């Protein structure tokens, strides 16, 4: 099996994209080589053996990212993604895709949306396991007090992503 890949320079640092069959299967901010290696290990665990082939625009994700960072907050919404996770993770990730740009949701509200209102920490863990952040917008989930909460790509990136979408967070 072949996985298409590309490194895209963004205002928030380099992002490595992975796609197969027209769908994005992985995305990671790869300012540290260890992050890229960790994502490739996760992909192998879910997809099995594969070879990487560098292409310009895997599954159109580079074009979508460029449009997003050029000011179109909806550019990432239509991207086809292929997700692999537990049934709970998949439910959380589906709900994340329903949060529109410029809006945020608390971890508790997201837990309620997946019919697991007491699973707030599990929602946070599912967010942290999101293999295609930005396209499955886990950065739109914030703490109940309105603070940023967490973000695997770093809180400075999360704040900047929300600002790009017109949302200011304390």
Kindly label every feature range from the protein language model.
Residues 100-103, 127, 131:
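Flexible interhelical turns and helix-capping residues at alpha-helix boundaries
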